[in-house]
Amino acid sequence: MLILTRRVGETLMVGDDVTVTVLGVKGNQVRIGVNAPKEVAVHREEIYQRIQKEKDQEPSH
């Protein structure tokens, strides 16, 4: 795992098309903004896991 330190307003790049910007820090919460092309799905981990679980439960044709 790559660990980076960023301050509010600073950005990191993921590949050529995705940026992640630290918008704010309040207590133990960090607000981030993600800019990505429409074809790149961006989800919170718990939402992504729910989507995957629902896909696994779909009957196959």
From Swiss-Prot:
Keywords tagged on the record: Activator, Cytoplasm, Repressor, RNA-binding, Translation regulation
GO-annotated molecular function: mRNA 5'-UTR binding
UniProt GO cellular component terms: cytosol
Locations listed in the record: Cytoplasm
Signal sequence residues: none
GO biological process, one term: negative regulation of translational initiation
Keyword Repressor: yes
Keyword check for Repressor: yes
Short name of any one Pfam family annotated for the protein: CsrA
Protein family: Belongs to the CsrA/RsmA family.
Subunit architecture: Homodimer; the beta-strands of each monomer intercalate to form a hydrophobic core, while the alpha-helices form wings that extend away from the core.
Free-text function comment from the UniProt entry: A key translational regulator that binds mRNA to regulate translation initiation and/or mRNA stability. Mediates global changes in gene expression, shifting from rapid growth to stress survival by linking envelope stress, the stringent response and the catabolite repression systems. Usually binds in the 5'-UTR; binding at or near the Shine-Dalgarno sequence prevents ribosome-binding, repressing translation, binding elsewhere in the 5'-UTR can activate translation and/or stabilize the mRNA. Its function is antagonized by small RNA(s).
Protein's name according to its UniProt entry: Translational regulator CsrA
Organism encoding this protein: Stutzerimonas stutzeri (strain A1501) (Pseudomonas stutzeri)
Gene field: csrA
